[in-house]
Design a protein with these regions (language model features):
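Charge-dense, helix-prone N-terminal extensions
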Residues: 2-131
Length: 131
């Protein structure tokens, strides 16, 4: 919660929309660089996949983790295994994502490594989430 409060304060101090977007992306890249190697490698690839496939999503920190927002609302996010003491990292979606599929659907995915198949699945899911 402290991380989120700091994010909100920093966001309020930023200047123009372009300056804010550049600063938020820089904060995401910096946070990714601080991660342990396995999480960092996955987070870097996810960041690249989202920027390549869904460029309308804006990177920003959300509770201290990389996330991607549309119109200021977080659609998807990455959680490092290290930060949460988990055995795997997580790529997940907020309730703003358009993933509804019947009465039940997955909202997060465990990641132990990022294969080309997983990258393709993430790209497809994120494209669908913002459609």
């Amino acid at each position: 919660m402290k991380a989120r409060a700091q994010e909100l304060k920093a966001s309020a101090r930023r200047g123009s929309r372009a300056d804010k977007a550049a600063q938020e992306e820089a904060a995401v890249v910096e946070k990714i660089a601080e991660m342990q190697e396995s999480d960092r490698a996955m987070a870097e690839r996810i960041h690249a996949v989202i920027k390549e496939n869904v460029p309308e999503l804006a990177p920003k920190l959300w509770y201290g983790m990389p996330s991607y927002a549309k119109d200021g609302k977080v659609v998807c996010f990455f959680q490092s295994a290290q930060k949460f003491g988990a055995r795997y990292a997580t790529f997940g979606f907020s309730d703003k994502a358009n993933l509804d599929d019947g009465a039940m659907w997955p909202a997060s995915y465990a990641l132990t490594e990022l294969t080309s198949e997983a990258e393709a699945m993430i790209a497809a899911l994120v494209r669908n989430a913002v459609s």
